[in-house]
Amino acid sequence: MFRPQVVGVTGRTDLGRAVRVAERVCRLCDREGFEVLVDDSLGIGEYPRVNLKDMGKEVDMIITIGGDGTILRVSRITSEYEVPILGVNLGKFGFLTEVSESGLKEAVSRLARGDFNLEEHRKLRIKIGGSDEGDALNEVTVITSRPAKMIRYRLSIDGFELETTWADGVLVATPTGSTAYSLSAGGPIVEPQVECSIITPLNPFKLEARPMVVSMDRRVEIDVDDPERAEVVVDGQEYMNLDGTVSVTRSPNVARFIRFGSTYFERLKEKFLRWD
């Protein structure tokens, strides 16, 4: 049974409430006997401080205060360390988060007892023009940098040129990201334990361009005719210049989330499927 000893705490620095909740989390963890390290950007002075990148190699788990965006940022920065993440939701949605502010005391108590499960989510590795650009937990998007102006891209799978399409762009998502931008663009919902990539065109200019699900072991490549008219966006947060072919493959890293018994389908029904 995995029982963390050293807990890292981070959160949204632009939200005063998040800083206050982070302070409370630190106190709760301290009382339960955890060693606490705090993201130095939070400015909490009572506990040892460390930058987020270094936190990944110093702690046994990280508690994030915010929402899904906070989790995506932390997961990307600490990707190589695969540190388990417990998300505390202060936002409106929080599909990846596990607890609310009201459930903090019980959550920290369960952490101390080792009363939780670890849930693994696959990531994608991104290269642009042969240069390694890290991992995506949700998706990598190649999109027009000029609103209302389409781009022409070529999609290849394992070196085989599959199609050429005019569109606003195209994204390659993980199963985790299937409930994010890809879903809004008409892509399918895929359970995180399915090892696949979802290729979803964005407003394509032909009826036959449809979302596609391929093995995560495939190499997906995207070439844009006029790279200066497009950009690459990772997890909706990191913007990059398009300096060559975008190559997307399975990452050797995974994201690990702490769960207290909730299942994927329970969260899916609660957040998305309100058909009853």
Swiss-Prot record:
Cross-referenced InterPro entries, in alphabetical order?
ATP-NAD_kinase_N, ATP-NAD_kinase_PpnK-typ_C, NAD/diacylglycerol_kinase_sf, NADK
Question: So where does NAD(+) get bound?
Answer: D68, G69, R73, N138, E139, K149, D168, T179, A180, Y181, S182, L183, S184, Q237
Cysteine disulfide partners in this protein = none
UniProt keyword Nucleotide-binding present: yes
* Gene Ontology cellular-component terms listed: cytoplasm
Q: Which cofactor does it need?
A: a divalent metal cation
The record's Pfam families line, in alphabetical order, gives: NAD_kinase, NAD_kinase_C
Q: Which UniProt keywords apply?
A: ATP-binding, Cytoplasm, Kinase, NAD, NADP, Nucleotide-binding, Transferase
Tell me the compartments it is located in.
Answer: Cytoplasm
Q: Which SUPFAM superfamilies match?
A: NAD kinase/diacylglycerol kinase-like
**Does the record carry DNA damage as a key word?**
no
Q: What is its EC number?
A: 2.7.1.23
From what superkingdom does this record's organism come? Archaea
Gene Ontology biological process terms from the UniProt entry:
NAD metabolic process; NADP biosynthetic process
Any one Gene Ontology MF annotation carried by this entry is: metal ion binding
Q: Which residues form the active site?
A: D68 (proton acceptor)
- Name residues in a coiled coil: none
Reactions accelerated catalytically: NAD(+) + ATP = ADP + NADP(+) + H(+)
Q: Which family does the record claim for this protein?
A: Belongs to the NAD kinase family.
Function per UniProt: Involved in the regulation of the intracellular balance of NAD and NADP, and is a key enzyme in the biosynthesis of NADP. Catalyzes specifically the phosphorylation on 2'-hydroxyl of the adenosine moiety of NAD to yield NADP.
User: By what name is this protein known?
Assistant: NAD kinase
What organism is this sequence from?
Methanopyrus kandleri (strain AV19 / DSM 6324 / JCM 9639 / NBRC 100938)
